Amino acid sequence: MKQTLLSLSNLTKQFDGKKVLDSLDLDIFDGEFITLLGPSGCGKTTLLRMMAGFEHPDDGTIALGDQDLTHTPPEHRPLNTVFQNYALFPHMSVFDNVAYGLKMEKRPKQEIRERVEDALAMVQLEDFARRKPHQLSGGQQQRVAIARAVVKRPKVLLLDEPLSALDYKLRRTMQVELKRLQRELGITFVFVTHDQEEALSMSDRVVVLKDGLIQQLGTPREVYERPANLFTARFVGETNFFPGRVDKANGDDTITVDVFGLKRTFRKPDFPVSGGQSLHVLLRPEDIRVLAPDDEDGVAGKIVERNYKGSTLDSVIHLEDGTEVLASEFFDEDDPTFDYRLGEPVKVSWVDGWEWLLPTEPEALPEEEGTDA
C-alpha cells in the first residue's frame, strides 16, 4: 500500500479573473517520481510554485502528512526546488554553492563538509568541488543544483523544467541520471515539463493538466496506451483518429465496428455503446501496419511522405477518402523491399486489440502558445 506524503486538496487559483487551478485534488506518494505534464498555461508551474510556497492558493490546502503547509513560508517547508536556470551563485565554488543552505542553518563545519561531499558523490561531481559554475557544462551545472537541493535532505524535491535548456543528447543522458538519483535517494520527485517523452520515460505516474484541471492521472503506459479523453490522446504522443460506427454489440464483451468499410471486432469500451453510434478509433503510429496494395486486408491509400530515422521508417499515408495516417515501423535492413516511394499505393491495417476507443465528444486541440502558468 503506497503512503501519501503530500496531499493537495481543492486548490484554486485565479490571476486577473482567470482560473489557473480549478478545485484541484492530488495525492503524491512517498518516494515516487511524479510528473506534471501539460501545454503552456495549463497550471503546472503554478501548482509547483504552490507546493514550494512561492504562490498561495485562493482556496484549498497543502499538507505534508499531518502538517498543514498552506501558508508556511518557502524557507520553512521541507521541500526544495531546482529551477530551470539552476540559480547557482557564479562567484562561489561548487562546494560553496552546495553548502550554502547548510551554512545558513549554521550547521557544524564537519557536518557541512561531510554532507556536501556525500551530495557531490551522489551526482558524481566530487572532483569538481573547487570549480566555479562557468567552468562547468550545462549538465554539470544541473547536477550541482540538484546536489544543493538534496544536501538539505528534503522530503520532496520539486523540479521546474530543469532539462529544457540542454541539448537533445545531454537531455536524454540527464533523464537517466535523474531517475537513477531519485531511486538511490528515495526522495519524492515532482517534475514539471511540457515534453511528453520526458514524462513517459522518467515517471512512476503522470498528471496530465489542461486549464487547471487534471485530465488524467496514471502510469506512463496508462496515459499513452489508454488515454482518458481526446485531449490526452492528442497531447501525449502522435495518434491516428479513425472514424468508427458501431455495427452491433456482440454477446462476448466485444462490439463490431465499421471502420472505412471494414468490419472489425473490438473489445467493448468502458463507455456505453449502441448500434449506429459514432466513436473514435485511436491507433498510435507504431500500431499501424503498411501492407502491399494487393493485400486482402486493410484500407487503400498512397505514400505521401517518408522519413528514415535510423531505427524506424516513418510514413504519412493518404487514404482514398483523404484521411491522413501516420505509420512508424522498425526498419528491417534485411528486407530489400522495406522502403516506399512517394506516391506508391499501399494498404493500411492493424492488429485487432491494439486500438483504443473514445466517444466522439467535442474537444479542443491543445494550445501551442501562451504564457505558462
Swiss-Prot record:
* SUPFAM superfamilies, alphabetized: MOP-like (SSF50331), P-loop containing nucleoside triphosphate hydrolases (SSF52540)
Membrane disposition: Peripheral membrane protein
Q: Which Pfam families match?
A: ABC_tran, TOBE_2
* UniProt domain ABC transporter: residue ranges: 6-236
User: Which principal EC class is assigned to this enzyme?
Assistant: translocase
Q: Which GO terms describe its molecular function?
A: ABC-type putrescine transporter activity; ATP binding; ATP hydrolysis activity
Does the record bear Transcription regulation in its keywords?
A: no
Q: Which domain of life is it from?
A: Bacteria
Sorted UniProt keywords: ATP-binding, Cell inner membrane, Cell membrane, Membrane, Nucleotide-binding, Translocase, Transport
Positions with a binding annotation for ATP: 38-45
Q: Which reaction does it catalyse?
A: ATP + H2O + polyamine-[polyamine-binding protein]Side 1 = ADP + phosphate + polyamineSide 2 + [polyamine-binding protein]Side 1
Q: Which GO terms describe its cellular component?
A: ATP-binding cassette (ABC) transporter complex
The UniProt transmembrane annotation reads none
Q: Does the keyword Ubl conjugation apply?
A: no
Q: What is its EC number?
A: 7.6.2.11
Subcellular location(s) of the protein = Cell inner membrane
- Cited function: Part of the ABC transporter complex PotABCD involved in spermidine/putrescine import. Responsible for energy coupling to the transport system.
Q: How does it assemble?
A: The complex is composed of two ATP-binding proteins (PotA), two transmembrane proteins (PotB and PotC) and a solute-binding protein (PotD).
State the family it belongs to.
Belongs to the ABC transporter superfamily. Spermidine/putrescine importer (TC 3.A.1.11.1) family.
- How is this protein named in the record? Spermidine/putrescine import ATP-binding protein PotA
Q: What is the lineage of its organism?
A: Bacteria, Pseudomonadati, Pseudomonadota, Gammaproteobacteria, Pseudomonadales
State the gene name recorded for this protein. potA
